[in-house]
């Protein structure tokens, strides 16, 4: 369940602007605020089934966008590769004892990778 919630949260972050305002709001309430379908429905004066339909439609749309684009999958893969490259750069820095051109290059690489991880 937690993996599904994390996956949906990432889809919302990446593609939420492609949804209607109501779909974004309902997904946020359901996945991020952890409100029940009944609570969401009551808030807007609709049925529980109505809230369920809006959320399900929005989730399907986000999943379909990801299936077509693979953006989230590629982003996750890139983050893993950046962590691996950072570990290698830090090991090179350690092995160079912080001295000379190799240490300088390794330190520059660590700084570049830190910047990439933050973006």
Which ranges hold each PLM region?
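Short amphipathic alpha-helical boundary/capping segments
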Residues: 10-19
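Short amphipathic alpha helix immediately N-terminal
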Residues: 21-32
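Hydrophobic positions on the alpha-helical face of helix-turn-helix-like DNA-binding modules
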Residues: 26, 39-41, 51
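Helix-turn-helix DNA-binding motif, specifically the short coil turn and the N-cap/start of the second
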Residues: 47-48
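Residues within the DNA-recognition helix of helix-turn-helix
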Residues: 54-57
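C-terminal flanking helix
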Residues: 59-66
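Intrinsically disordered, low-complexity basic tails/linkers immediately adjacent to helix-turn-helix/homeobox/MYB/SANT
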Residues: 69-96
């Amino acid at each position: 369940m937690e993996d599904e919630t994390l996956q949906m949260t990432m889809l919302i972050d990446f593609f939420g602007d492609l949804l209607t305002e109501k779909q974004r709001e309902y997904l946020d309430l359901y996945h991020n605020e952890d409100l029940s379908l009944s609570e969401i429905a009551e808030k807007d004066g609709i049925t529980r089934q109505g809230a369920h339909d809006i959320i399900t439609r929005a989730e399907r749309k986000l999943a379909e966008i990801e299936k077509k684009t693979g953006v989230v999958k590629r982003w996750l893969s890139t983050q893993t590769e950046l962590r691996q490259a950072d570990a290698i750069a830090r090991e090179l820095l350690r092995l160079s004892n912080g001295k000379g051109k190799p240490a300088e290059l390794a330190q520059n690489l660590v700084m570049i990778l830190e910047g990439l991880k933050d973006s």
